[in-house]
């Protein structure tokens, strides 16, 4: 399957009520989402209480620039309704030791990942 995905990470985690509202809004959006008059085969849902994931199957119909603009408008409007910013690309979801994901700023996440990688390299070097 040829698929295209879009991920928008918010600036905070959402409540259960907000997630339910957003999942319903996403379902309505993707069910009516079109490109040049043709319906797109897509799904959308909230990911890890803090992000929006939209995936389109592009085998039959490919998403166009206009249809991608519609995603951005939808996410911007949803963010306005929720008082959230889904367009700050410094927000990331990082796995934690519990197997869950937590919201972090890229700078902090990058430092932690670099530190972790350096520790692994040091441990490997100590073996030799």
Positions of predicted regions on the chain:
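Glycine-rich, often proline-containing surface loops adjacent to acidic residues and nearby aromatics
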Residues: 2-7, 48-57
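Terminal interaction module
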Residues: 86-128
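Short N-terminal secondary-structure initiator segments
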Residues: 1-7, 123-128
